Amino acid sequence: MSQRGDRGEGHARRPGRSSSFGGGHRGGGGVGGAGKGGGGSSGQPPLATNRSFRKSGNGHGGHQRAVSQPDTHGFQPAPAPTALQTPPLRPPAPQNAPAHVPVPAPRPQHHDPSGARAPTLPPSSENTANAPPLKGIPHAAPRAPSRISSTSTSQGAPKGGAYNLQFGSFPMNGGTGGSTMQFPARTSSAPPNLDEQKRMQALPEGHKVVPSGLVPQAPKHQQQQQPLQQQKQQPQSQPPLQQTRKDVVSSNHSSKPINPHIPSQVKSSVHVSPSVPNVAPPRPPVQQIPGMPMSMPFHHQAPLQFGGHNPQIPPQGVVPSSLQMSMGLHGANAPQVAQQMYIPTIQHHHQLQPPTMMHQAAGIPYGPAAHQLTQMSGMMNVGVAPQFTPQQPNKYVTGPTRKTTVKITHPDTHEELKLDKRMDSSGQRGLPSVQQQSQPVSTYGSPMGFYQQNSYNQSTMFYPTTSGVGQVPTVSQGPRFVSTQTVSYISPSMNTGPGSNKDNLAGSTTSGHSQVTGKPHPAGLHMEKSGVQTVTISAPPGKSDVNKLKPAEDVVSHRQKDNEAVSGVRKSGENESKASPITEKHPTPVSQPLQALAANPETTAAASFVVNSVPGDDGKSKESIQRTGSFKDSNKNATKDTRNLSQEPQSASSAEDLKVHTSVKDVCCGVSLMESKGVNKESEQTNAASASPTEMLKAADASSIDRSSARSTSESTENVQEVGKSDVAIGDSEKSGITNKVSPDLTKDDISSGSTGNESHEVCTLDLAEQLPVGASNPDNLDTATSVTDQGQLLKEPSSSVSDENVIMDRSHQSAEKMSDLVDDTVASVASSETLPESIIQNANAKGNTSGNQETGSATSSNILNVLPVPHSVASEDPLKPESMLKDQSSSAPAASARPVSREKPSVEITRTKFTAVKKKKRREMLSKADAAGSSDLYNAYKGPEEKVDFIGASESLDSSSIADHELPDESSEKEVNMGEDEGKKKVELDDWEDAAEMSTPKLERSDSSNQTTEANGRKRYSRDFLLTLAQSCTNLPVGFQMIEYASVLFPNLAGKSYVVDHPSPGRGADRPASRGDRRGVVIEDDRWGKSGHLFGSGRDMSMDNGPPTMNHRGAPGVMRNPRGGLINVGPVAPQMSRSGSDADRWQQKGIFPSPVTPMQVMHKAEKKYVVGKVSDEEEAKQRQLKAILNKLTPQNFEKLFEKVKEVNIDNVATLTGVISQIFDKALMEPTFCEMYANFCFHLAGALPDFSEDNEKITFKRLLLNKCQEEFERGEREEAEADKTEEEGEIKQTKEEREEKRIRARRRMLGNIRLIGELYKKRMLTERIMHECIKKLLGNYQNPDEENIEALCKLMSTIGEMIDHAKAKEHMDAYFDIMLKLSTSQQLSSRVRFMLRDSIDLRKNKWQQRRKVEGPKKIDEVHRDAAQERHAQSSRLARGSVVGSGPRRGAAPMDYGPRGSAAALASPSSQQVGHRGMPSHSRGFGTQDIRFEERSPLDHRTTVLPPRKDEAITLGPQGGLARGMSIRGQPLISNAELSSADSRRMVSGPNGYNSASTAREEPGSRIPDRSGRIAPNTQFAGPSNRPASQEGRSGNKLYSEDDLREKSISAIREYYSAKDEKEVALCIEELNAPSFYPSVVSLWVNDSFERKDMERELLTKLFVSLCNSRNNLLSKSHLTAGLATVLGSLEDALSDAPRAAEYLGRLLARFVVESILSLQEVGTLIEKGGEEPGELVHHGIGADVLGAVLESIKVEKGDSFLNEAKASSNLKLEDFRPQHLKRSKLDAFMKA
C-alpha cells in the first residue's frame, strides 16, 4: 500500500510488526517511526480518533509518523546498516512552509539524530510478526520531521535539500543541511491542515488492498527508500510498520493473510476504516482462536500502566488507529516482553468512536487468546485480566524473546554505548528494550476526542479479574483526550528542557530506557516515551569523551501521573523545539546516569546536552533545549523505594563515561538542588553545577544584562561555545513560541524521591522554552548559551547547591506559567544557585549583549533547562494542562514533563500574556508572605498560572542578599519569558478550542511596551531564605487581595485537569496510583472539582494512568496524596475510586485557598457576641444549674446527680422554693417519674438544713406541703377556667383551645395527685392531708367530675394500702361506698367506671396489684423487656410456621431467631443455630429481619430450647383446651447438651423466662398468658406417638452444672429487675434439678452480699416464697445445705464484702421469723460452718453472724419473740464467742 510520507500522515504499518514494548506498544510514536528512534515501529498504527487529525502520531511515543518500511523488512533479514546510515530523505520542503503544512517525508524509524544506527535485529527472527518484541528504547518522535538540521555527518545519507530525517528528536542524517518542517498540532477548531488534504489525495494510493503475502504497499516515495530503511530497520528487532494516521489496522491472531478493507477517508476528522492486514501473531502458549472481531472502544494513547511492584516498563503509546492490543506482561524484576494482541478483521470508523483497541488490564502472560477476550457491546471496553498468573520475568511465553540492545554510537568513533546492562538499584536488568508495560487503560467507552457524556463513563468499565500474582493486574486505563493528550512519559529521569522534548536523550539516558527524544505532539498529546525503544544515540562529536552511560538507577519508566507525559511537545511556534526536541549534536545526548554521577562527582555534566541551534526552515535557529542530562544519582545505594522511576535498565554504559566538556556547565536557574537527606548528597546534586558561593555572589552582583545573563566568574565562555558550537537555536520566542518549559513542577518527590529522601530534588525553575526571547538574536549568539552543567562541580559543592526543599516544592508546584517569572529569575536564580557554570554565565553575557531578551533566552534557556535534575524527573510540559496544572505535573510526574504546547499555531500566533510589573510584584509579595507562612509551596502550586510567582531556587547556602541584589538585567527577556510562558498556557493543547476559552487570560497579558529592563522596573528577585526573614513583619495580604480572583483562573482548569502535584507519578509501578478520582466517569462526579458543563474539564489530561490498583497502596513517597483517597479494590467492586481527589482538598480544608467552585463565604459577626451560660444573677445561675440536674435525672444516675444537687449552695428560702417548684413542674409533666421525684424530695429533705425567716422556721417539708396544696388548688382553678364561658371583654377561645387547656390542667392535676401519693408513701405528707385530698376529689358525687374521679382512682392505687388500716377503716368504707355507686352511674364514661371498679377490686385483693404498676424503667430493663417481646413474637411466628409446615421429618429447619422467622425458610444452613439463635451461616438474601440491628446488647441469650431426649414439646396455647392439639415431634436438634450460653438462655416470656413446661397436667395449673414463653428455637419434625398428656413437665431435660449455674444466676438477676417470684419459680421448675437447688441457694446468697439492701430484701422474700410454695420447690434440706455452703465460704466472702456476716445474719433471722428455720437450726449451721467445722466460731465470724441474727429478730419482732426463740433453741451463746475476742455482737445478748 503506498502511502504518503507527509508529516501529519500516518502510514499503514505492517500489522505483523510487534512494537518493542517487549511485545507491547511501539516504542516510539504511534507508528513505527512515530516514535522516531523507538526501537521499533509502534505496534499499532495511529488511530486518528483525536479531534484534530493533525496529530499524525497519536501514539504516545511521538507525534510524527515514520514512513513504514517495505514488507520485506518484516520477513527478510537485511544487512544491518552502517552506524551512520540514514533513511532516505523526502523531497525538500520549503523552509518557510507553514508549520501546519505537511511536508511529505519518511520518518526514519530507528535512527539516532546523529545517525547512530539502530540496534540490530537478531538474525534468528525471521518473521517480524513472530519476532520477540524489541527491547529498544522508544523515542517519541516529533509530530513533524525535525527541521533542525544536524551538522553531524551521516554517512550514506543522501542530503536532500532541506530534508532532515529525524530520529525522535534527533535528525536522522545528523547534519544541518536541511531542516524539516515541524508542524504544530492543532485542535479540531484550528484551521484545516493541508497535510490532511494531501492525505486525502494520497489515501487512494495508500490504501491498496494488501496482498495475501502480508506485504503492504509502501508509498511510492518510500518504495525508493526501502533499501535504505530495510537496512536500518532490519537490525532493529521490529521494523516500523507503515500506517496512515487515520488508518486502523486490525491485527489477526492467526497468521493467515487477510485483505485489509480500507474505507475511503472522508475527512480529517473522521476515522477511516483501516485496512486489516494480516498479522503474524507471536506464538501464544495458549490455543489461539483465529480471529475474534470485537467491538471495543479504543482508548487513545493510553499507555497501559505496568502494574508490577518492580521497574515499570515504559508506557507504550497505543496508537489510536492500531487494532493491535499491547498486553503488558507482569514481570517481577526482569525485563518483560509485552505481547501484542491482534484482533483481526476489526474495523472501525472514526465516526463510531469506539475503536477496537482493547486494553487489557494486566499483561496477558500468554499470547492473547480469543477466548480470553470479553465481547462487549456499545461503548463498553473489554477489560481482560490475565486468566493465569502473569509470567515471571524472563519467561516470555510469546515467541522467541528478542533482546535488542540499545546502541548509542558516537558519530565519530561509532563506539556503541550499550544500554542492555541492567543497572538499576535492584541490580537487575531494567527493560531497556521493553516498552513500558502498557498501563492498564480504563475501559471507558469511546475515546474522548470529543466530549461524549458516556465516553468517559464508568458505567462501561469492565474490570479485569485480579491475578494471583502479587502484582495486581493493572486496571485498564481510561482513554485520554486524544486531541490534546500527550502521552505521559513515565521516565521521570528525563530532564526535558523546555526547548527539548521530554524525549530528549538527556532525560532518556538517565533513565534506564534510552529515551527517544520525543517531539512535541502535534495535538499537544503528551508524548509518552512510551515504549522506550532501543535508540541508537550517536554521541555528538562535540563531546570530549563518549563513555558508556551507566544506567541511571531510576528509569524514565515512571510515567507522569497525569500524562505529564514526557512528550516534550512544544509550541508549534517553536521551530527549534518542533524541529527536534533535542536534536543535539552535542555530546549531551544522554544525561549522566545518577549512578555515574554519584560514583564520579567530578564527572562533568556528561549528560547535559549542549543544544546546537540549527537554523529552522524559517531560517531561525531552532533551540534544542539544552538539558542537563545528568541526574543526581538519587541514591548511591539506590534503594527500590528511591527508584522513583520505573527501574528500567539504564544504558549499560556508565554516565561517567559519557562526558561533556567539563568546561561547559549547565546552570539550572531556579533549580534548587535538594541535598539528599543523607545518602549521596554530593552525587545527587549532579544537575546543578554548584558554583562556589563567591561565584554566585558575583553573578548576583552583576546588575547589568550581562550580569543577569549570569556571567560565570571562573568558566570561560569559550568552553561553552565550544560545546555548543551547534548553535542552540533558541529561535525567536515569537516564532518558536516555545512553550515547553522545564516544568518547575518537579515535585520534591519527583517521582519517588521522597521515598528515600536520598534523592536530591532539583527543580529547574526556569522555563527555557518560555525564556526564549522573541527577539532572540542570531542563534549564533545563543549557541554559546548552551552549556553543560559541570556535574563534578555540582558534586563538589552539593551543599551550596542544596536548596530549601520548600523552594523546590515551590518550583515543582509552580506551573509553567510561573516559569516565566522564573525565566526572569533564571539568571538571578542561576547566579543565586552556586551551581551556575561560569561558561553559562558568559554565554548569557554574550547573549545578553545581543539583547535583553536574548540574554534571558540564551542564558536561561541553555543553562536553566539543563537543570531540571530532579532525580529522574524531567519537567515536561503537559500539553493538556494549563501551566497552572503543570505545577502539579512537576510534582506528580517524576519524569520531567515538558508541557507540550499546541504546536499547530506558530509562536507568533500565540498571544503572550504578560503580567504587569505591578501584578507580578503583588504576586511576589503575596507569595512571599504565604511562603513565610510555610504554605507557599502548595499554595503557589494551586494558584492560577498568572498568579504563580516562582521563587528563585537559590541554594540555601547562598546569601539571600546576594540573590536579592541580583536583578534580571533585561525586562524584555523577562517579557519574553512571560510571553513564552503565557504562550505555554495558550498553547497547551486543550482538548478543544472551546476549552481554550477557559484558558484565555487576556487580562493577564502585558503589553510589549511595558517590557522594561528588570532594573528599570525595579523588580528584584529574592531568595526564599531572605524572604523568610521578613515573615514576622509581613503578615497581612495585600490590600484588596481576594483569593477568589486567583481561584477563578485556577479552578476552570482544575475542574477538568489532572494535577501533577495531586497525582504524582509514583516512583514505581506498584506505587502507581490507580484510577484517580478526578478521572471518574459520568456516574461518579468529583465532589470537589466537578465542574458543570465539562465533565472532564478543559484540557483535562484524561488519565493515562488510570492504571493498576496501587499494589503497595502508596504513592510516590514524597508526594502528598489525597488524605481521603481510599485504597481501591481490584475489580468492579471499587472501580476507579482509589483516590477521590487531589491534595488541593487538604489545602482547601486548611483554608489556604478557597473552594474551587464557590467563593468564600463572608462570615457575619454579631456586634455583641453571645456567650453561653453567663448569668449575672447568682440566684438565677443556681436555678439553671438545678434545672440542668433535674433534666438529667434518671433512676440510674439518681445518686450521682443528687450529690451534685447537694453541691449547689442551697442556703436560702428563695433557692429552696425554686428547687421545689422545679421538682413539681417536672413531676406534673412527667407523671410516670413521680416516684423518682418523690424519692428525690425525700432525700433532699434529709440533706438540706432548716432555714429561718422572720424568726420562723422554714423546712423543706413545710414548703413542699404548701406547694402541694397550691398545686392542688391550682388544678381546680384551671379546670374551672377552662370550663367557664368567656366573659365580655375577654379574648374568645376556640373549642380546640379550650379543650387543650382543659387537658393540660387535668394532666397537671393527675400528676400532682400522684406526686402527693408518692410523697405520702415516703412519709413526707401526713395521713390527714391524704384524707382531705380524697374528700375534695370525691366532692359533689351527685354530679361527679370525671377528672376528679380519675385522680381519686390514681391516688387510691398509690396510697390505698398505707391508708387502709383499722383506724381509718370507717373513712375508707365511706369512700368506697361512694365509689361503688359512681361505678354504676351512667353519668360517667365507661373508662372512668372501669377505673372505679379496678380500685374497688384492688381493695378487696388486699391492695395487691393485678399487674405491676409501670414505673420508670432503667435502660437495661427497657432492653430486657424489648428482648422478651421479640422472643414472644418469634415464638408465635415459629409456632405458626411449624403448624403450617406439618410434621414432616426432614422439613426445612425453621429459624426461630430472636428477630422472628424471616429466615425460617432460608437455606438449610440455618439448621446450624448459632449463638443467639442466629444461623451460623449467613441467611439467604433478603431474609434478614428488620430488627437485626435493633437487637439490644443485652439480648444475648439464645432462644434455643435445650433439646429433650425423646419427648415432644407442646406448642401453642397452654390451657386445657390446647392440650393434645399441638403438633409434637422429635426435634432435629441433636440431643447433645447445648453450650452454657445457649442453655442458660431460655427466657422468652414477658419477664424473660421460658415456660415451655407450663402445660401442666394438674387441673387449675393453667397460668394465664404464658404462650410467649414457648421455646421458640426448638424444631419439630417427626411426630411422636406419645399422647399429649404424657408429656409431663419439661424438667426431664438434663443440664450440665455450668448450665444450671448460669441459669440460676440469670434467674435471680431477672428477679431483681422484674420482682416476679412466680417467674423464678417457673425457672426452678424448668431446671428440674433438685440436687442442684442447694447450689442455687448458695449462689444467690453469695451474690446478694454485693448487692443493695433492697435486693437482699427481695431475695429473702423469694426464699420464703419458694419454701412456702405449694410445690415446695425449695425444701428445708435444700435451704440448709445451701446455707451451709455459704457459711463454708463466708470467710473468703468477707474479703470482698466486709459486712457479709451481717447480711447473712439478717437473712437467717428472716428464716427464723418466718418459721422456715428454727433458731437452734441456725445455731447448728453457724457452729459447724467454715472450711473446717467450727472454724467460723474459732475466728469469731460465727459470733458476728449469730449476733446479727439475734439483732435482726429483736428489731423485727421485739425482745419477747427473741427471748422466746432463745429459750426454745437452748443455744449457749458462750459457745459461739471465742475467748480471744475482746468484744463481740453477742456480748449484748449474753448479758441479757
Swiss-Prot record:
<feature type="region of interest" description="Disordered">
    <location>
        <begin position="1"/>
        <end position="285"/>
    </location>
</feature>
<feature type="compositionally biased region" description="Polar residues">
    <location>
        <begin position="644"/>
        <end position="654"/>
    </location>
</feature>
<comment type="similarity">
    <text>Belongs to the eukaryotic initiation factor 4G family.</text>
</comment>
<feature type="region of interest" description="Disordered">
    <location>
        <begin position="491"/>
        <end position="590"/>
    </location>
</feature>
<dbReference type="GO" id="GO:0006417">
    <property type="term" value="P:regulation of translation"/>
</dbReference>
<keyword id="KW-0648">Protein biosynthesis</keyword>
<dbReference type="Pfam" id="PF02854">
    <property type="entry name" value="MIF4G"/>
</dbReference>
<feature type="compositionally biased region" description="Basic and acidic residues">
    <location>
        <begin position="1290"/>
        <end position="1299"/>
    </location>
</feature>
<feature type="compositionally biased region" description="Acidic residues">
    <location>
        <begin position="1278"/>
        <end position="1289"/>
    </location>
</feature>
<feature type="compositionally biased region" description="Basic and acidic residues">
    <location>
        <begin position="964"/>
        <end position="990"/>
    </location>
</feature>
<keyword id="KW-0810">Translation regulation</keyword>
<feature type="region of interest" description="Disordered">
    <location>
        <begin position="1275"/>
        <end position="1299"/>
    </location>
</feature>
<dbReference type="GO" id="GO:0006413">
    <property type="term" value="P:translational initiation"/>
</dbReference>
<feature type="compositionally biased region" description="Polar residues">
    <location>
        <begin position="147"/>
        <end position="156"/>
    </location>
</feature>
<feature type="region of interest" description="Disordered">
    <location>
        <begin position="960"/>
        <end position="993"/>
    </location>
</feature>
<comment type="function">
    <text>Component of the protein complex eIF4F, which is involved in the recognition of the mRNA cap, ATP-dependent unwinding of 5'-terminal secondary structure and recruitment of mRNA to the ribosome.</text>
</comment>
<feature type="region of interest" description="Disordered">
    <location>
        <begin position="612"/>
        <end position="659"/>
    </location>
</feature>
<feature type="compositionally biased region" description="Low complexity">
    <location>
        <begin position="1461"/>
        <end position="1470"/>
    </location>
</feature>
<feature type="compositionally biased region" description="Basic and acidic residues">
    <location>
        <begin position="545"/>
        <end position="564"/>
    </location>
</feature>
<dbReference type="GO" id="GO:0016281">
    <property type="term" value="C:eukaryotic translation initiation factor 4F complex"/>
</dbReference>
<feature type="compositionally biased region" description="Gly residues">
    <location>
        <begin position="21"/>
        <end position="42"/>
    </location>
</feature>
<protein>
    <recommendedName>
        <fullName>Eukaryotic translation initiation factor 4G</fullName>
    </recommendedName>
</protein>
<keyword id="KW-0396">Initiation factor</keyword>
<dbReference type="GO" id="GO:0003729">
    <property type="term" value="F:mRNA binding"/>
</dbReference>
<feature type="region of interest" description="Disordered">
    <location>
        <begin position="999"/>
        <end position="1018"/>
    </location>
</feature>
<feature type="compositionally biased region" description="Basic and acidic residues">
    <location>
        <begin position="633"/>
        <end position="643"/>
    </location>
</feature>
<feature type="region of interest" description="Disordered">
    <location>
        <begin position="678"/>
        <end position="761"/>
    </location>
</feature>
<feature type="compositionally biased region" description="Low complexity">
    <location>
        <begin position="216"/>
        <end position="243"/>
    </location>
</feature>
<feature type="domain" description="MI">
    <location>
        <begin position="1603"/>
        <end position="1727"/>
    </location>
</feature>
<feature type="compositionally biased region" description="Polar residues">
    <location>
        <begin position="179"/>
        <end position="191"/>
    </location>
</feature>
<feature type="compositionally biased region" description="Pro residues">
    <location>
        <begin position="88"/>
        <end position="107"/>
    </location>
</feature>
<feature type="compositionally biased region" description="Polar residues">
    <location>
        <begin position="1576"/>
        <end position="1593"/>
    </location>
</feature>
<feature type="domain" description="MIF4G">
    <location>
        <begin position="1183"/>
        <end position="1406"/>
    </location>
</feature>
<feature type="region of interest" description="Disordered">
    <location>
        <begin position="874"/>
        <end position="912"/>
    </location>
</feature>
<feature type="compositionally biased region" description="Basic and acidic residues">
    <location>
        <begin position="1490"/>
        <end position="1503"/>
    </location>
</feature>
<feature type="compositionally biased region" description="Low complexity">
    <location>
        <begin position="432"/>
        <end position="442"/>
    </location>
</feature>
<feature type="compositionally biased region" description="Low complexity">
    <location>
        <begin position="699"/>
        <end position="718"/>
    </location>
</feature>
<feature type="region of interest" description="Disordered">
    <location>
        <begin position="1537"/>
        <end position="1600"/>
    </location>
</feature>
<dbReference type="InterPro" id="IPR003891">
    <property type="entry name" value="Initiation_fac_eIF4g_MI"/>
</dbReference>
<feature type="compositionally biased region" description="Basic and acidic residues">
    <location>
        <begin position="1559"/>
        <end position="1572"/>
    </location>
</feature>
<feature type="compositionally biased region" description="Basic and acidic residues">
    <location>
        <begin position="1411"/>
        <end position="1432"/>
    </location>
</feature>
<feature type="compositionally biased region" description="Basic and acidic residues">
    <location>
        <begin position="1"/>
        <end position="12"/>
    </location>
</feature>
